[in-house]
Amino acid sequence: MNSAEQTVTWLITLGVLESPKKTISDPEVFLQASLKDGVVLCRLLERLLPGTIEKVYPEPRNESECLSNIREFLRACGASLRLETFDANDLYQGQNFNKVLSSLVTLNKVTADIGLGSDSVCARPSSHRIKSFDSLGSQSSHSRTSKLLQSQYRSLDMTDNTNSQLVVRAKFNFQQTNEDELSFSKGDVIHVTRVEEGGWWEGTHNGRTGWFPSNYVREIKPSEKPVSPKSGTLKSPPKGFDTTAINKSYYNVVLQNILETEHEYSKELQSVLSTYLRPLQTSDKLSSANTSYLMGNLEEISSFQQVLVQSLEECTKSPEAQQRVGGCFLSLMPQMRTLYLAYCANHPSAVSVLTEHSEDLGEFMETKGASSPGILVLTTGLSKPFMRLDKYPTLLKELERHMEDYHPDRQDIQKSMTAFKNLSAQCQEVRKRKELELQILTEPIRSWEGDDIKTLGSVTYMSQVTIQCAGSEEKNERYLLLFPNLLLMLSASPRMSGFIYQGKLPTTGMTITKLEDSENHRNAFEISGSMIERILVSCTSQQDLHEWVEHLQKQTKVTSVSNPTIKPHSVPSHTLPSHPLTPSSKHADSKPVALTPAYHTLPHPSHHGTPHTTISWGPLEPPKTPKPWSLSCLRPAPPLRPSAALCYKEDLSKSPKTMKKLLPKRKPERKPSDEEFAVRKSTAALEEDAQILKVIEAYCTSAKTRQTLNSTWQGTDLMHNHVLADDDQSSLDSLGRRSSLSRLEPSDLSEDSEYDSIWTAHSYRMGSASRSRKESAPQVLLPEEEKIIVEETKSNGQTVIEEKSLVDTVYALKDEVQELRQDNKKMKKSLEEEQRARKDLEKLVRKVLKNMNDPAWDETNL
């Protein structure tokens, strides 16, 4: 190995020169190009003698800056080591490079002889300098470091004169970054197939062949014998030689990096709080609630990070063999877990505030000195905790990589890595769950009944589970939300456009039983009770199961204390007990009917005060609160408007998206503008309304016939399904059951079939109601309830005949006319643009033809 090769290896070993991944044909040319700007030279001297370089240009842009770096290196060498150096212009211009090379070889020898490159190699001019190589103080450093460095660059030329293949063992883990590289773990055995100078070898491991860094491995031999390199100048180190010095130096470098980045992260948190969030808290830009969402528990996290920095500093003051970095992290892990999980749970609400008030917050941030756009600075600042949390496993992995095998802190470092990985994954899960929870609380829920969901209180816990009712083998995906007094069940619509209400379970009298894993279920628990039919709930993970069991058991104890006595007639209407099915109150006094439904039934207080009278409903379906019967009870569910259906199909034609994108925010109801209001007030609009009224009156004249026909259909269908109705009320109740069953399982139906089932249930209700009207009330016609048959063509070309209310049909037609007018305006505008473009093209063509016909035009004009 010649002097150029030795110098390249020396610089790479010290970490001041990047190792080339390809074979170097001429080491001298490579070295000359690497040293030309003087950055490597300054980095080398700063590594050997920290603090000797006063000024350096890390990225020189011109000749003067390059020469300045070289002269700074020469000045420091002359002042500190009194070496015979070279001329700066010679190195920059590529002249007399032998003199430059000779100076570097001399520098290598001098620093090795005086013991530099060991204690001083990784020392930094920092107030947090770490003690290193304490165990080396009893040994002489004379010529030892030279042999240490030689043992490193000896690996670059480890060919043997014998025909036996070179076998090496990995000292560190290596992960490939290119396709032609070879990945391996610490301790793996690699068969070397090609040895090249420059720091990279080719080898085979587990059937794969690729390139790997030679300083990541060591040779496996029965006895260490002198190697015969090409130059014949370097020998293998003696048997008792210590090969851990450089690993120790890297360990201290990584530890120093952890400490410095921890300082920087703590300062960034304090800056965000003092510069932006605290002034925002005292201003009137946002309400106090929104400001608290933005703040979260960032104050507590900032205080905790300062404590963590102090603990790490105390740890680094100890000798290396007594440092307990992993133990420091493990001792603070419970507090860190609590703080970061709370921050993750609040972050979706903070993002919602950022989105809603982005303009105001952006202006406020820019007034406080933030760069434009100011909202981006705040968003990045609030994301700092997640970014830092993701870096801990990587930093600790690097620290463990350069740690001695028998270091007492190795086991704690490995435990800390696992703990941080679990915490990071748990934080991501909490963020996703809270985003979904916020979406459920802010968007409309289909088929919702009762008070608004916000009146139920705060959500204690929620997740996606699989439920199975007693006596049924069918499993359904559900979203469970636990509120202070009840458990809410939702399902996602078939097209993932929103959520569908499925029912509520009161926590009063609820019993939670954790089940052992079996072939049929894993991570499952059972919900039961005197008023509740058994429900089997399967969770996605063991952690999710633990959370549900803990929260539900705690919740049931709280509700039991607050409600010591439970009476059947005082049960809320939105409950799911399991009672025998009784068709009417008439059977309650006689022998009970042995009917055990495979789904949950809902208690309904009897009109006569009998607590035993129950009315069956569909699985997990809410009952309707008892109200005085009126004609408005016959109103159907809102029909699917054609314009909304078309938009819905357009969304389905796009590529799949994430759950968040598949559940978009509901489009707000269209409000009439001032222009529309004025039109409605006009005489023409009044005449149009008069015409609509005439059409309604014409259809009302045939209402009696249609209702009689619906009654006939209803009776036939009831007989077909063996449903008996003794009076008007039981008839309506049985129809309610059919209505619930018709929309029971949205996961098995399309959106169109779901709405068809709603219209079918409406027809049953209309038929039964018409019979009641004949017997007890005079004929009353409501325009909103009159139906017409509409023939509609779907997007797939299929023609469907639907029944819609007259008023909804008229307004749908009005919307379609409005859309046609807008399309007509767009087409007219496009036509005008096309005409203008054609005229411009015609002028251009005429001009070109005129020039071509001009006799003065010839090839000389080209």
Swiss-Prot record:
In its UniProt record, which GO terms are filed under biological process?
hematopoietic progenitor cell differentiation; intracellular signal transduction; lamellipodium assembly; negative regulation of microtubule nucleation; nervous system development; positive regulation of apoptotic process; positive regulation of growth hormone secretion; positive regulation of GTPase activity
From the UniProt record, which GO molecular function terms apply?
A: gamma-tubulin binding; guanyl-nucleotide exchange factor activity; protein kinase binding
UniProt xrefs under Pfam families: betaPIX_CC, CH, PH, RhoGEF, RhoGEF67_u1, RhoGEF67_u2, SH3_2
The PTM entry states:
Phosphorylated on Ser-673 by CaMK1; enhancement of GEF activity and downstream activation of RAC1. Phosphorylated by PTK2/FAK1; this promotes interaction with RAC1.
Q: Which residues form the PH domain?
A: 452-557
Indicate the segments forming the Calponin-homology (CH) domain, all copies: 1-112
Record's subunit section? Interacts with PAK kinases through the SH3 domain. Interacts with unphosphorylated PAK1. Interacts with ITCH. Interacts with SCRIB; interaction is direct and may play a role in regulation of apoptosis. Interacts with GIT1 and TGFB1I1. Interacts with FRMPD4 (via N-terminus). Interacts with CaMK1. Interacts with BIN2. Interacts with PTK2/FAK1 and RAC1. Interacts with PARVB. Interacts with YWHAZ. Interacts (via PH domain) with NOX1 (via FAD-binding FR-type domain).
What's this protein's name? Rho guanine nucleotide exchange factor 7
Lineage runs:
Eukaryota, Metazoa, Chordata, Craniata, Vertebrata
